[in-house]
Amino acid sequence: MDRSRVAIVIPAYNEAETIGEVVTATMAFGLPIVVDDGSSDETTAEAEAAGAIVVLHSVNAGYDSALNSGFAKAAELSCVYIITMDADGQHDPDILPRVIEHLERGADLVVGVRDRRQRVAEHLFAWLGRWRWGIQDPLCGLKGYRMA
């Protein structure tokens, strides 16, 4: 797989302590695009130093806005697949080849599943996701998308 076909969108807000390691761990699998959502720390500098493409929001616009900006950048770069993951390091980058493999085989969406215990509201939403759509953890930040 040509890594330039895969964008790894990482929304980040004040994640200077972890973002460099997350970016470094994803470099072999795609183009890390960090969306710094108005951080007041050194998130942008750490992400750039690790080799990420950085999209900078001047103010905190929220998670959805950060994802939208990352998807727009991925489209601008003509990426075929987009993988989203959290900036805090909770997702194991070693799973990325499996996500890419599912996308290459024709999946339009791949959703990760977290190992940690969920809060009550997350548990209820996960139950609804399993019941309605067959998705184990709809709130997990690790997802893979096929661009159409």
Please report, for each region that a protein language model flagged, where it lies by residue.
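A transmembrane-helix-recognition feature enriched in membrane-embedded lipid enzymes
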Residues: 119-137
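Conserved nucleotide-sugar donor-binding
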Residues: 127, 140-148
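Structured catalytic core of nucleotide-sugar glycosyltransferases
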Residues: 1-119, 145-148
